[in-house]
């Protein structure tokens, strides 16, 4: 999957996208003046069939739209994010090619299909995981990443709303 931003992203949004690339099997491109059509062309040149466009509100990432190769939005998340400082995230690395999905929220299971992440098999070691947990009244769900040593790493994504 190719990750990009809305035009003229803030530093925080760029940092979030780069931290996503470190935990997902994906690439990031600076959008600049590219149209979505240009981003889709670049995506297919790089061998991806989906893109994730990170939009922002008041300088912070606030929405992730997943689009297919035709530019149709297939899933949308309204989010707030926690971006770890570099010291915290360096303690654990995710092997993105070995990433598995563990979800407590059945409605968000399709994120695994969208991002080509296989499901976690019970009894397997708790490493290289994307975990979706139920949230509270403010956030419906929380996405956390666990590295190859089982320690939490990468961005924490608080999901306020989703649409498919």
Where are these regions (language model features)?
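Phospho-regulatory, Ser/Thr- and acidic-rich intrinsically disordered linkers and terminal tails
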Residues: 1-164
């Amino acid at each position: 999957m190719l990750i990009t931003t809305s035009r003229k992203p803030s530093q925080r949004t760029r940092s979030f996208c780069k931290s996503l690339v470190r935990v997902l099997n994906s690439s990031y491109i600076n959008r600049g003046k590219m149209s979505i059509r240009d981003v889709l062309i670049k995506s297919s040149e790089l061998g991806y069939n989906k893109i994730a466009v990170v939009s922002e509100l008041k300088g912070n990432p606030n929405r992730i739209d997943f689009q297919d190769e035709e530019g149709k939005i297939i899933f949308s998340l309204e989010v707030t994010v926690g971006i770890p400082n570099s010291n915290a995230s360096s303690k654990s690395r995710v092997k993105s090619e070995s990433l598995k999905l563990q979800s407590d929220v059945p409605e968000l299971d399709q994120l695994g299909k969208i991002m080509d992440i296989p499901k976690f098999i019970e009894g397997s070691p708790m490493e290289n995981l994307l975990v979706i947990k139920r949230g509270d009244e403010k956030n419906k769900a929380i996405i956390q990443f666990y590295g190859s040593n089982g320690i939490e790493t990468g961005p924490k994504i608080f999901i306020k709303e989703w649409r498919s």
